[in-house]
């Protein structure tokens, strides 16, 4: 089964299916602050040391579940239905939910579309800083 490909022009690994056999992760960071993020926004953040300086709780024996993580939830106020900008943790049916993850050097972009709502979340650590940015863009394509 094909889960993605390398984009030579943009120097990114592009994951085209969110249901990978295990979490495919990327490292974001600076010397003082780091983060590990998977193709479904799972992972953790840490200051200086991934072993001793964790900021976001992460259970290494929970890797198969790829949780907790950096989840952005989206809700349709009319129907009450909700989903996440990354496939996990809600895991809507793949026949209806489209997703793409682009792991680049020091950034990850997760894009999705469900029920005519597009989302794109860029995750990165600004160079030399001790925080991470989650920049979200949500577009209703039905209007």
Model-based region annotation:
Residues 1-143:
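Anionic coordination/interaction segments
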């Amino acid at each position: 089964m094909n889960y993605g490909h390398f984009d030579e022009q943009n120097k990114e690994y592009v994951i085209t299916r969110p249901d990978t056999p295990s979490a495919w992760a990327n490292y974001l960071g600076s010397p003082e602050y780091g983060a590990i993020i998977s193709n479904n926004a799972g992972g953790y953040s840490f200051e200086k040391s991934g072993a001793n300086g964790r900021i976001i709780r992460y259970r290494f024996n929970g890797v198969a579940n790829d949780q907790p993580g950096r989840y952005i939830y989206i809700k349709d106020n009319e129907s009450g239905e909700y989903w996440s900008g990354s496939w996990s943790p809600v895991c809507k049916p793949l026949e209806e939910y489209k997703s793409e993850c682009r792991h680049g050097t020091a950034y990850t972009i997760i894009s999705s579309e469900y029920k005519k709502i597009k989302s794109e979340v860029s995750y990165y650590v600004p160079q030399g800083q001790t925080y991470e940015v989650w920049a979200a863009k949500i577009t209703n394509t039905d209007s």
